């Protein structure tokens, strides 16, 4: 198991913080040096930050690019694509992430499920939609509570058993 999560990492937008914060740039480094039976792509919400502001079409193209990189560099790996839960506007507005996310970010986050589902079908990825499982915490509008993390883990475990 290689855990490659990173705070504030974007999936497909060039992050001003550099290569380690930009998913499509750092992903090949992991894929070229490791063999993975299963790759979990649970990324994308940071691309909706107000100063990046991609259209939904750009979002879809960016996530597709990430899947294509994964398929090209690790063709035998199975992919689980995880759609993030919709952001919580009240939590965003009242929390520490209001400088990064806004009402438009929240609205777009609520429209990601069909994009992820369509890409999962197109590229034959397993698909988990967190919107059907948990909501983000109202404390910051972005992250999950410990209870929600447990629920996500249990659902991911079930999916992994089916995938293997």
Regions found by a protein language model. Name each.
Residues 3-5, 83, 129-131:
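Residue-level recognition of beta-strand->loop/alpha-helix junctions
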Residues 33-42, 78-83, 123-128:
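Short coil-to-beta-strand
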Residues 42-48, 69-106:
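Active-site segments of SGNH/GDSL-like serine hydrolases
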Residues 1-75, 107-110, 143:
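Conserved SGNH/GDSL esterase-like catalytic core that processes O-acyl groups on lipids
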Residues 1, 140-164:
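Histidine-centered active-site loop/cap adjacent to the catalytic His
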Residues 25-26, 58, 65, 115, ...:
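Alpha-helical elements of Rossmann-like donor-binding domains used by nucleotide-donor carbohydrate transfer enzymes
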Residues 10-11, 48-50, 88-93, 135-138:
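Short acidic/His/Gly/Ser-rich catalytic and metal-binding motifs that mark active-site loops
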């Amino acid at each position: 198991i290689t855990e490659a999560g990173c705070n504030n990492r974007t999936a497909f937008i060039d992050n001003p913080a550099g290569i380690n914060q930009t998913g499509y740039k750092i992903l090949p480094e992991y894929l070229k040096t490791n063999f993975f039976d299963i790759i979990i792509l649970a990324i994308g919400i940071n691309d909706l930050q107000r100063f990046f502001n991609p259209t939904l079409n750009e979002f879809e193209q960016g996530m597709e690019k990430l899947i294509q990189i994964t398929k090209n560099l690790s063709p035998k790996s199975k992919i689980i694509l995880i759609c993030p839960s919709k952001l919580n506007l009240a939590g965003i507005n009242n929390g520490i992430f209001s400088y990064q996310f806004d009402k438009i970010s929240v609205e777009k986050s609520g429209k990601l499920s069909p994009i992820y589902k369509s890409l999962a079908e197109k590229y034959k990825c397993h698909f988990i939609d967190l919107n059907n499982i948990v909501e983000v915490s109202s404390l910051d509008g972005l992250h999950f509570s410990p209870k929600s993390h447990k629920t996500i883990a249990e659902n991911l475990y079930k999916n992994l058993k089916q995938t293997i």
